[in-house]
């Protein structure tokens, strides 16, 4: 009898250990349906790609839309008051996790909750924006990925001055976007080091973008568009002016490059969204809290060149550039 009891105890202990080991791993396979709130400041290819990457990471790790996950997707259409209302709605609905796709989107949800887990992406300066204390110590309920590589702007502005011969650089941005202010400051610093001048044009809505581009005609040798949600959402207006007036247009990310920019130092936003999705998986699995996950950055930036856009905008392509850039296929 004693041997039987010992054997039974061993079996039960082993079963409990196995159950404990598998509980976190199998969190996605339970009966619970998770509601994930998605807040995005505006529609444009980079942000849309980040969201697709986020969903892909969740699906590949057992959190599938229509199965055990429901996405409540909200787009603010570049309206700050809409973004604030979306934040209130998602928090009021008590979603299980929030995916904040842009700096203002993340700020607005963080202002509304210190309890619901938040993962952000497409954020240029999370510390400067007040989203996190530091990359290593994000905060109680928030973490995510930044879309900034420290080499990106120096690479692009350096190429504009040293290789494309730009002595004056026009920059269009929304001064209401904190992420844009950070980028424009860096553009000015690099340009000054290179002996070039920067002409800034600030706008507040996408309807002002074309007029801003037209105001730079005859005043600049090239234009640089940062990762600014307002301007990027109306990028075709800038491309039209650049093509008509032979002004090389340099941009802040690869999706804008594909739309008609000459060159960009960047990475794939879908990959960045996927990276953020893996963070969400750890949180949903119960493996880690947001405060225990460091803010992450994209991999090294690569300067990529669009030959077709260069020809359209009157920029002569030099043979030696083949050693400096990757050409868009």
Regions found by a protein language model. Name each.
Residues 77-133, 228-243, 247, 252:
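Beta-alpha junction/loop-to-helix N-cap segments that form part of ligand/metal-binding clefts
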Residues 126-168, 268-288:
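Hydrophobic alpha-helical segments within soluble ligand-binding/sensing domains
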């Amino acid at each position: 009898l004693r041997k039987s009891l010992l054997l039974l105890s061993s079996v039960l202990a082993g079963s409990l250990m196995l159950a404990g080991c598998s509980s976190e791993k199998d969190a996605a396979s339970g009966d619970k349906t998770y509601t994930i709130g998605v807040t995005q400041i505006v529609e444009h290819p980079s942000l849309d790609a980040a969201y697709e990457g986020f969903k892909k990471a969740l699906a590949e790790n057992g959190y599938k839309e229509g199965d055990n996950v429901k996405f409540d997707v909200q787009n603010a259409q570049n309206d700050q008051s809409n973004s604030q209302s979306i934040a209130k709605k998602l928090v009021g609905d008590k979603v299980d996790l929030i995916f904040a796709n842009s700096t203002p989107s993340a700020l607005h949800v963080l202002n509304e909750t210190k309890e619901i887990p938040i993962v952000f992406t497409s954020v240029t300066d999370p510390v400067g924006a007040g989203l996190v204390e530091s990359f290593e110590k994000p905060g109680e309920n928030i973490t995510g990925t930044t879309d900034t590589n420290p080499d990106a702007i120096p690479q692009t502005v350096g190429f504009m001055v040293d290789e494309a011969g730009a002595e004056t650089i026009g920059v269009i941005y929304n001064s209401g976007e904190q992420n844009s202010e950070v980028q424009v400051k860096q553009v000015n610093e690099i340009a000054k080091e290179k002996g070039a001048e920067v002409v800034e044009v600030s706008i507040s809505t996408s309807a002002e973008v074309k007029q801003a581009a037209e105001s730079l005609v005859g005043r600049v040798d090239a234009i640089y568009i940062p990762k600014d949600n307002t301007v990027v959402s109306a990028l075709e207006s800038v491309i039209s002016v650049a093509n008509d007036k032979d002004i090389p247009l340099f941009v802040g990310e690869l999706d804008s490059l594909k739309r008609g920019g000459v060159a960009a130092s960047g990475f794939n936003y879908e990959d960045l969204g996927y990276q953020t999705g893996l963070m969400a998986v750890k949180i949903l699995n119960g493996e880690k809290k947001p405060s225990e996950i460091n803010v992450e950055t994209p991999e090294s930036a690569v300067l990529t060149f669009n030959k077709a856009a260069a020809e359209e905008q009157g920029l002569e392509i030099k043979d030696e550039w083949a050693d400096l850039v990757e050409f868009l296929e």
